């Protein structure tokens, strides 16, 4: 009986150590599908991914020369803030604004309004573009 009780306590202890998602339906890996600019131009995206977990966002362009960048992520109310992007593997090197453009980001500190977020799709809008994502 004592062994069963210890086993149950051990299992409860292990399961309580998991980090719960703090960003709701935004947490996870997302593929950027389109960037709709305010001037009417629509850009179809090819192999651009956002990975969101806790207070970090990783953006990466696979198969191109966009590289991978890691930044700070904050989600409050219906607003997302992404900032302080650095090159993955060389954290001393800040990401330039030109390097952020293929990801639909145009500022060092990006504020986006979450228009809609389900478990499968999300739409975010900034002052320059509307980003459409699908869960990956």
Task: Please tell me what each predicted stretch does.
Residues 126-135:
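Short, low-complexity, Pro/Ser/Thr/Gly-rich segments in the mature regions of secreted, periplasmic
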């Amino acid at each position: 009986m004592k062994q069963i009780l210890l086993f149950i306590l051990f299992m409860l202890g292990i399961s309580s150590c998991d980090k719960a998602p703090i960003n709701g339906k935004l947490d996870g890996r997302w593929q950027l599908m389109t960037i709709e600019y305010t001037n009417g131009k629509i850009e179809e995206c090819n192999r651009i991914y956002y990975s969101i977990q806790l207070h970090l966002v990783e953006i990466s362009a696979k198969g191109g020369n966009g590289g991978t960048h890691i930044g700070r992520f904050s989600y409050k109310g219906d607003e997302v803030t992404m900032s302080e992007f650095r090159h993955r593997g060389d954290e001393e090197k800040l990401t330039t604004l030109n390097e952020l453009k293929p990801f639909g980001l145009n500022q060092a500190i990006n504020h986006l309004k979450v228009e809609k977020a389900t478990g499968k799709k999300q739409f975010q809008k900034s002052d320059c573009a509307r980003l459409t994502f699908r869960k990956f």
